[in-house]
Design a protein with these regions (language model features):
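Bacterial N-terminal signal peptides
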Residues: 8-17
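Short solvent-exposed capping/turn motifs at the termini of beta-strands
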Residues: 53-57
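N-terminal edge beta-strand
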Residues: 25-41
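A short tyrosine-centered beta-strand micro-motif
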Residues: 195-201
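Short, aromatic-rich amphipathic segments at membrane interfaces
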Residues: 187, 210-239
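Membrane-proximal low-complexity regions enriched in glycine and acidic/polar residues
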Residues: 87-193
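Sec/Tat signal peptide C-region and signal peptidase I cleavage site
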Residues: 19-24
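Juxtamembrane interface at the cytosolic side of transmembrane helices
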Residues: 247-261
Length: 261
């Protein structure tokens, strides 16, 4: 089975590579900052991405139909258990669960227009352009795989992520300032996870993938929150003892203040 998966992956890469013509465009991009600092007062922010599509040679012609841009931002990976509940005899009960393995904790997909106006449905699925087209590995009994797009667990997983601002899809999220210069704003909610974020920009024209470029940024804790996090990781035993002592002292102080004579 492993051999078959490897052969399928090679075939997919060959298909994608075959859809990219000889380099005629070069993508240059930059982001406004590579590090975002958060503390207890963090309410969210955004990162601005700028880029340009340049001919790779003086003889390359500008595309008559213009360029299309798709920006994908993926946060730290995590494993999530999605549970489905039903009301039985007046009580909400878990009736099923699904484990999503190593999926992005944050995922944003930004483009300059809807995907069906950029390329064919088959290419949209092949390149995994939209949220609905992304592969989310799941634990299915003893097997690991993805399921159909309208699977209720998968749909609910994406819906809940979008409600918290952790999954975003905006088909007007990329602005073409000129036919070759573009701008995109990456929204980061207050609950954005700490860690590294990968940014990928893909250029398409006439429905075909022409070029891609990658960048990255990170979200870090600063101030007292960072001190506490470091203490918990590096001095686990001491941190646990200190926390327990503080809880005991707080309880004792409250008992003294509010006791009745």
């Amino acid at each position: 089975m492993t051999r078959h998966l490897a052969m399928a992956a090679v075939a997919l890469l060959a298909t994608i590579a075959g859809s990219m013509p000889a380099a005629a465009e070069r993508l240059v991009m930059s982001i406004s900052r590579h590090q975002v600092s958060v503390n207890s007062n963090f309410t969210g922010t955004s990162i601005v991405l700028f880029g340009t599509v340049e001919p790779d040679s003086p003889t390359a012609r500008r595309r008559a139909g213009g360029y299309d841009l798709v920006v994908t931002v993926a946060g730290p990976k995590q494993t999530i258990v999605e549970r489905r509940k039903e009301r039985m005899l007046g009580i909400w009960t878990n009736v099923g669960s699904r484990t999503f393995l190593n999926v992005p904790s944050y995922l944003a997909v930004l483009s300059n227009q809807p995907f069906d106006q950029i390329t064919s449905p088959d290419t949209v699925r092949q390149l995994q352009l939209g949220l609905a087209d992304k592969l989310f590995p799941q634990q299915l009994g003893n097997d690991i795989g993805d399921v159909v797009r309208d699977d209720p667990f998968r749909a609910n997983f994406i819906r809940l992520k979008m409600q918290h601002g952790l999954y975003v899809q905006r088909t007007n999220g990329v602005t073409l300032l000129t036919p070759t210069v573009f701008r995109a704003e990456i929204p980061l909610p207050a609950v954005a996870p700490i860690g590294n974020y990968d940014v990928e920009v893909r250029v398409l024209a006439d429905g075909a993938l022409l070029a891609r470029a990658n960048s990255a940024f990170e979200i870090i804790k600063v101030g007292f929150e960072q001190f506490v996090a470091n203490a918990a990781q590096e001095y686990g035993l001491l941190y646990g003892i200190t926390t327990a002592m503080m809880a005991i002292m707080t309880g004792w102080f409250a008992a003294v203040v509010f006791r009745r004579d």
